[in-house]
């Protein structure tokens, strides 16, 4: 878990949620620097959450953001399991339906932005609804 200095000078521990939120902001800025446009963050639908929704041209990009301090145990990208992929697909399906779309009518993909230590890895089209 990360620490941040406080006004008193002694560091305080960030919660897991605060750490995740900070890395999601980093990922959003990094992707915007690559030309993607921000649509939404922390989208909750029944059964799941999508960290970021971005647009690249006409493509809707659902982004899972992961952070690990080290590559021990496979690093950040390896932590996106089949179960997590299924939840993301279901959440995206519900979000698209709320916006009058579906996987058949909207060009979309699922990316992973993985921060491992000081390294960033952008895995475009990491998985899809046919995986």
Swiss-Prot record:
Database matches in Gene3D superfamilies: 3.40.1350.10
Protein origin, superkingdom: Bacteria
Any Pfam family the entry gives: UPF0102
Compositionally biased residues, Polar residues: 1-19
UniProt-annotated stretches for the region Disordered: 1-20
InterPro entries: Restrct_endonuc-II-like, tRNA_endonuc-like_dom_sf, UPF0102_YraN-like
Coiled coil: none
GO molecular function, one term: nucleic acid binding
NCBIfam families on file: PRK12497.1-3 (NF009150), YraN family protein (TIGR00252)
Family in the record: Belongs to the UPF0102 family.
Annotated protein name in UniProt: UPF0102 protein YraN
């Amino acid at each position: 878990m990360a620490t941040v200095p406080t006004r008193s000078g002694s560091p305080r521990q960030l919660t897991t949620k605060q750490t995740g939120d900070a890395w999601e902001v980093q990922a959003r800025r990094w992707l915007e620097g690559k030309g993607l446009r921000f649509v939404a963050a922390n989208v909750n639908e029944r059964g799941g959450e999508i960290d970021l929704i971005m647009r690249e041209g006409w493509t809707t990009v659902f982004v899972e953001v992961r952070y690990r301090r080290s590559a021990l145990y496979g690093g950040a990208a390896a932590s996106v399991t089949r179960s997590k992929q299924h939840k993301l697909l279901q959440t995206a399906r519900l979000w698209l339906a709320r916006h009058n779309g579906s996987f058949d009518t909207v060009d979309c993909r699922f990316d992973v932005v993985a921060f491992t230590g000081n390294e960033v890895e952008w895995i475009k089209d990491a998985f899809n609804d046919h995986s």
